[in-house]
């Protein structure tokens, strides 16, 4: 065999895809859990469930059940190995890429287990798939803390118990207390909250950072449909990012906004795309402001700033970044209003109902709509059919978010809203107004750990 010459080695390197090209191929294989876990038959199942025709919805997941996750896992490993063995990859970057590739593999396997559960031909197969799914779900997203769950639920139940209710409201309260384990006057442990000084500091940050973006929301309008929201987002991307010569200067080139079938507004960083559900939902001005801050001002912005470095995973998210990603979005919404309020409580309670109280979809739903409705009623307040219908629709959506993918097993992905907001507020409290340390949190998709801060500090402009 002819021995390779230095010239042959040079030609081999020239013919190799770059790390950036390989990374782009890898992110094309991103485990799209939100997309895969979107039911194809939601409207029909929702109608039958809310009318009482069926006890439990049987959602069908067309994209999930037809995907080839074994092939996807093989490609992730193949491309991942090419990146890790690439001559242009700095040795100091290797560990970050290893964690990133491992996370993609883990999330792809989680989708595979959900598919196996849905397509199981026997109870034995279903049980085996369920066990594997539950384990990897907790490994990926954590599990609800029981003390926190009991505290959050107990706080709401104590408040409802102390209200002076009559008629239909009192009847619903009795029904609710018959569904949950509640002891009047139960001790509620104190939970973390940031100081007023930290909230005020973040309020000034939000006003400065997002003032230009929010100026694109028409002043004279109070409600917005999906296509009006699409235009607002598109205008912000063009004017505040691409045409801003002093600021981001074209950093959002290639980013688009579409209105299409979806369950929620979703930033798809790997595709440079923001998706808005085309379901006709009208959103208030306040809700649109929060979406601008959360979706563009956090999710999209951190992807753009991370993409401007030589550490490509900062564009998509380092390992274990997700809680802080959603947490920062929630924190910035609160910072804009200048008021702290616990967020993600409803998601946390749904997870706790399913995990600790073993409620199925119907069981969790029946608790949630009563809890939400009675939480909003004042002393002596009346409850009408319209309020009940609205509460049921909201509870259905929230319960679906928790049980999506399998219909039976709670997905803990949405714990990030509560856990992440606490993580970020604790971090902000600890840095006490340090704008530089705050800027590191906006410089890519990272969490609040010292390890992630070090990655940001050691990265270089691309």
Language model features: what each stretch is:
Residues 94-283:
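Contiguous, non-catalytic segments that form substrate-binding/exosite surfaces or channel walls
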Residues 292-301:
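Active-site His/Glu-centered metal-binding helix of metallohydrolases
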Residues 284-289, 293, 320-325, 391, ...:
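Secondary-structure capping and boundary motifs in well-ordered enzyme cores
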Residues 285-286, 301-326:
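Post-HEXXH active-site segment of zinc metalloproteases
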Residues 90-94, 223, 282-287, 315-319, ...:
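Short, charged/polar micro-motifs that form catalytic or ligand-binding hotspots
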Residues 343-462:
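Conserved alpha-helical "signature site"
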